[in-house]
């Protein structure tokens, strides 16, 4: 990526465009995630309809079905819903691991100046929702406080699906910011899950898991993509991490971290991390996450005490954290960063745009539901968490739609400018003259 340090005397610009190669890569990612977001929404809606239909018992029976009762020796006698959360989401987190490594080695996060904005925004978007949740639940104390991390996550696929529905054409700099913010957000979520939501910890299986992870890393570092060897090694690593008490999805991240980013040979078009990300992202976005959403979102509201749900501190804390906390954290930290560094917004961006993106980041679906399952296993509290995450995400989506749709005319004009290639060399003019 080219150096984007502004000339001396010129104010630094926030949300400026990336380089053209990075823009093309991000466009491919966003297309896949947008499609996956549509499937995610479909899975969640089907789950809600089924769980509240006369056939709700069959939904519960499907979710609780144990496909391998004989796996008790390895603690793998899991029901389908748990397989979706612990198994399929490991694919999602493997892609996250690839994303993180690519961003830190060859993407925006390798440059401290460009990394500062999404990192500061993500940290603010984690701390403020957590503080709001804790503040609301402090009096209740006890088990309620275990849910402090639920409203801290951002679901990029859900957010992109909302953008597709409202027909918004966010400027490239804002799209890059939203995606990088989500990547940093995922890193923080992984750290939180590994540290705060580990069960009965066993050191020996975790240490043994390092062996298949190391062998996996050795093969991919040598550019050996022998699936007959890599997939069994990944399964063994996942099994051992699961046995250790650390959430099994962490294995996916660790495996992703072992994959090299830079091209091994001069003739290679892409590094192996980008190649594997291209292969596995459709599986993650198009299958793993929608199936998890199908099993995680099926909360039954039939006969529920709606008054009790609405006044439950857990529910209030999650909804307030997602809707208010994310906006205050992301918008506020970005505003303070601009003030302290005397930076200016890119010419095509307004503070209203950032407000809309901050609201989009309040859509915390997949990882929020996962953390909710880890914090409150089943029961009334577990169902209330699902209802709260769904409610908060829908409110955030509606508010973001209201804010961003008002700027659609300007976004279409910017999108046309970003496509203009007057000399027909395959690179739009704005990416050749980014300082102009």
From Swiss-Prot:
Stretch forming the signal peptide: none
GO cellular component: plasma membrane
Gene3D superfamilies: Na+/H+ antiporter like domain
Protein known as: Na(+)/H(+) antiporter NhaA 2
Species: Salinispora arenicola (strain CNS-205)
Name of the encoding gene: nhaA2
InterPro entries xrefs: Na/H_antiporter_dom_sf, NhaA
Record-annotated membrane-spanning stretches: 35-55, 80-100, 116-136, 147-167, 176-196, 201-221, 226-246, 283-303, 313-333, 354-374, 385-405
GO terms (BP aspect): regulation of pH
NCBIfam families assigned: NhaA
Function text: Na(+)/H(+) antiporter that extrudes sodium in exchange for external protons.
Source taxon at top rank: Bacteria
Claim: Transmembrane helix is one of the keywords in the record: yes
Membrane topology: Multi-pass membrane protein
Family, per entry: Belongs to the NhaA Na(+)/H(+) (TC 2.A.33) antiporter family.
Subcellular location: Cell membrane
Catalytic activity: Na(+)(in) + 2 H(+)(out) = Na(+)(out) + 2 H(+)(in)
Main location: membrane
HAMAP family named among the record's database cross-references: NhaA
Keyword annotations of the record: Antiport, Cell membrane, Ion transport, Membrane, Sodium, Sodium transport, Transmembrane, Transmembrane helix, Transport
An MF annotation (GO) of this entry: sodium:proton antiporter activity
């Amino acid at each position: 990526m080219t150096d984007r340090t502004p000339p001396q005397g010129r104010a630094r610009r926030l949300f400026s465009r990336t380089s053209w190669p990075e823009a093309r890569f991000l466009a491919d990612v966003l297309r896949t995630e947008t499609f996956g977001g549509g499937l995610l929404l479909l899975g969640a809606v089907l789950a809600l309809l089924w769980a509240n239909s006369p056939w709700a018992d069959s939904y519960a029976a499907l979710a609780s079905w144990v496909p391998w009762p004989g796996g008790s020796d390895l603690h793998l006698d899991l029901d389908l819903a748990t397989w979706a959360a612990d198994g399929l989401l490991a694919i999602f987190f493997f892609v996250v691991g690839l994303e993180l490594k690519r961003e830190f080695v060859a993407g925006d996060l390798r440059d401290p100046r460009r990394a500062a904005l999404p990192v500061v925004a993500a940290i603010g978007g984690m701390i403020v929702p957590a503080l709001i949740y804790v503040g609301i639940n402090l009096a209740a104390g006890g088990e309620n406080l275990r849910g402090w991390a639920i409203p801290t996550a951002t679901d990029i696929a859900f957010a992109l699906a909302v953008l597709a529905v409202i027909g918004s054409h966010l400027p490239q700099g804002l799209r890059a910011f939203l995606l990088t913010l989500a990547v940093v957000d995922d890193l923080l979520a992984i750290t939180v899950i590994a540290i705060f939501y580990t069960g009965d910890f066993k050191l020996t299986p975790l240490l043994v898991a390092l062996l298949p992870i190391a062998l996996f890393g050795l093969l991919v570092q040598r550019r050996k993509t022998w699936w007959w060897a890599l997939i069994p090694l990944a399964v063994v690593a996942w099994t051992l991490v699961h046995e250790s008490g650390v959430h099994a999805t962490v294995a996916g991240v660790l495996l992703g971290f072992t994959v090299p980013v830079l091209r091994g040979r001069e003739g290679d078009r892409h590094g192996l991390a980008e190649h594997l990300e291209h292969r596995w992202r459709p599986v993650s976005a198009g299958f793993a996450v929608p199936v998890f959403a199908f099993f995680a979102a099926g909360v039954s509201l039939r006969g529920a005490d709606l008054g009790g749900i609405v006044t439950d501190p857990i529910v209030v804390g999650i909804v307030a954290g997602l809707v208010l906390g994310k906006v205050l954290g992301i918008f506020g930290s970005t505003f303070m960063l601009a003030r302290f560094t005397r930076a200016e917004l890119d010419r095509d961006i307004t503070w209203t745009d950032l407000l809309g993106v901050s609201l989009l980041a309040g859509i915390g679906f997949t990882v929020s539901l996962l953390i909710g399952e880890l914090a409150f296993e089943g029961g009334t509290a577990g169902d209330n968490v699902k209802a709260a995450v769904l409610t908060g995400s829908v409110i955030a989506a509606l508010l973001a739609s209201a804010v961003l749709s008002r700027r659609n005319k300007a976004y279409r004009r910017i999108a046309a400018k970003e496509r203009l290639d007057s000399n027909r060399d395959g690179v739009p003019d704005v990416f050749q003259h980014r300082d102009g």
